[in-house]
Amino acid sequence: APACVGFQGMR
């Protein structure tokens, strides 16, 4: 699974 789906990669 991707690490930037809209919670951890948007930091």
From Swiss-Prot:
It is found in: Secreted. The modification Arginine amide is found at R11. GO terms for biological process: neuropeptide signaling pathway. GO terms for cellular component: extracellular region. Keywords: Amidation, Neuropeptide, Secreted. Myoactive peptide. Increases the amplitude and frequency of spontaneous contractions and tonus of hindgut muscle. This is Tachykinin-related peptide 5.
